[in-house]
Structure formats: structure tokens, C-alpha cells
Amino acid sequence: MKIILFLTLIALASCELYHYQECVRGTTVLLKEPCPSGTYEGNSPFHPLADNKFALTCTSTHFAFACADGTRHTYQLRARSVSPKLFIRQEEVHQELYSPLFLIVAALVFITLCFTIKRKTE
């Protein structure tokens, strides 16, 4: 128990926060700086703007900001070739076979069948 508490304390002390953003490839993404005096760690062009904001060209990239208080904000940009909501008609939207709701129901049915078969064999 003490080891778990110690590991939890270490994880909280490191304070690494993750931010995920999807965007359309080739556009500019406007993000807010997590801390005003942070250090930028990344290899993509970074354009600081007013009001603690910055702009990046949307490509699949990974970068981070290290704040003065030791908190590290890690950003992951995922570029799409087109917008996911663009050109989608309502009648073309269909339910996928492996949606989370379907998988939960299938798992419950499977577990119920396993216990039913086990009781019949005993």
C-alpha cells in the first residue's frame, strides 16, 4: 500500500499534462500557451502571438512546453487530409458494427452464456 501511495505521489509531482488536437492538414492552429514564461520544446515552427497564444501549421507533430513551476504540457497535433464533418450527409451516416455500445452488449451476452453453460454442466 505504501508503494502505491509513493508511486502516486511521484506521478503527481512530475505533473505532465497532455493535450490532443485534430486539425485539417495545411491550416493554422491557434492554441493558448499553458504558461506565460514557458520554454518551447519542439521542432515545428512556433509563432508566438498576443494574449499568450501561439500558432502552428497543422501537421502531425509532437511538442511540449516546460513551465517555470515544473509542469510540462505535451501537445499532440494530428493532421487530417479533410475535415471529418465536411461533405458528410445525414443519410450516409451509419452505425458501425464495432461501436462501444455493441461491444458492451456482446460482452454481457457472452459472460451470461458462459455462466449459464457452466451451471448446466454442474
Curated annotation (Swiss-Prot):
Domain of life: Viruses
Residues on Intravirion side: 118-122
Gene Ontology cellular component list: host cell endoplasmic reticulum membrane; host cell endoplasmic reticulum-Golgi intermediate compartment membrane; host cell Golgi membrane; membrane; virion component
Residue ranges constituting the X4e domain according to the UniProt record: 16-81
Cross-referenced SUPFAM superfamilies: Accessory protein X4 (ORF8, ORF7a)
Membrane as UniProt keyword: yes
Keyword Transmembrane: yes
Motif (Di-lysine motif): 118-122
Endpoints of the signal sequence: 1-15
Function: Non-structural protein which is dispensable for virus replication in cell culture.
Record's protein name: Protein 7a
Gene source species: Bat coronavirus Rp3/2004
Organism taxonomic ancestry: Viruses, Riboviria, Orthornavirae, Pisuviricota, Pisoniviricetes
